[in-house]
Amino acid sequence: MLGRKAGDNTQVRALADELGCGYEEKHILARPWELLVHLGSGVTLAGIDKSASTPLLPPWPDLVISAGRRNEPVARWIKQQSGGRTALVHMGRPWAGLDEWDLVVTTPQYFLPRRDNILHNSLPLHRLSREQLQAAADALSPELADLPRPWVAVLVGGDSGRFVLTGAKGERLGMLANQLAAACGGSLLVTDSPRTAAAAANALQAALTVPHYCYRWGSGGANPYRGILALADAFVVTGESMSMLGEAFAMGRPLLIFDVGDGPQPWWRLAHNFRYKPLSHRLAMWLGPERMRRDIGNIQAELVASGRARWLEPGAAGAAAQALTAASIAPEQPPGSLAARELTATVAAVRRLVTVR
């Protein structure tokens, strides 16, 4: 079951593909006011734009894999229509009670308890095979031939939950990434995403003076994201994107996190926090039950504390460049080892669930 968020869709598809069973994709489009409907506990399709979504018709499936608040009522509705026969697997943190789900696959930013129907992973799931990465690398390599190495990828997300990637933050990200590339004598491979505001992307690109390759979402041509993942010697990732952090980490190369937060000042003093997305997120956090809390900082802190990542901060370019240089002469870490283990464990849990039923 797919929605509007690329990160959610990546996890759902990764699990479905790895299961190796036949499946159908159902694209669900929610109405703008769906939050008001979904605050209740009932099973309803009232918040769904049925005319813009994939039709939901019998025969009902043995398994539904979903992610995100907007798709929850649809998954539960399907189970109701099947007379309880359909098993439900949800990625992340559900709004409905935990007993409504046969399995919840979660990560540290959510504060879910330890229980039999909850599987805790360290990072979001993804499924990038060596063959896919190699093909993407082969396609992109000619465009990067004249850029000096090391190649530092800059993976840019955007507005998500309470985080807003403003033009000023885009400029700061560009300046810090520029300093890092200059310190190690390399170049930048920059790609943004559908969530990246034009003001942030423009400010970031304007701040770059080192050699660089820059792809803007919607600019036409093949998306180089997988090629950049395959070829980059190090990664800078905006911290609000758990999926991009997980995919970059899985490559086994140095990882730096750019903090998209607003710092210590109260949120209500900043005009951008009164936009619909950050304001509705705070509303959801206030009105939802206590278990609905989310702190992306948990994943970031875990990555940094374990030495798997470091912060991209002012004045840190020299130390980061030294770490990048040291990594380039050290034996390369096996890409995706942790991610692959967690995907395998998740698949095993889902197969047990379906077999038992």
Question: Where would I find each of the regions flagged by the language model?
Answer:
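Catalytic donor nucleotide-activated moiety binding site of glycosyltransferases and closely related
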Residues: 184-220
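Conserved catalytic-core segment of nucleotide-activated headgroup transferases in glycan assembly
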Residues: 159-192
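Active-site and donor-binding regions of nucleotide-sugar-utilizing enzymes
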Residues: 5-120, 245
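A donor-sugar binding/catalytic signature common to diverse glycosyltransferases
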Residues: 4, 227-268
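Generic beta-sheet signal
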Residues: 91, 107, 121, 191, ...
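A nucleotide-sugar donor-handling region in carbohydrate enzymes
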Residues: 99-166, 340
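C-terminal amphipathic helix plus adjacent low-complexity
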Residues: 264, 269-357
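Soluble, non-transmembrane catalytic domains of enzymes that act on hydrophobic metabolites at membranes
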Residues: 4-29, 170, 174-175, 192, ...
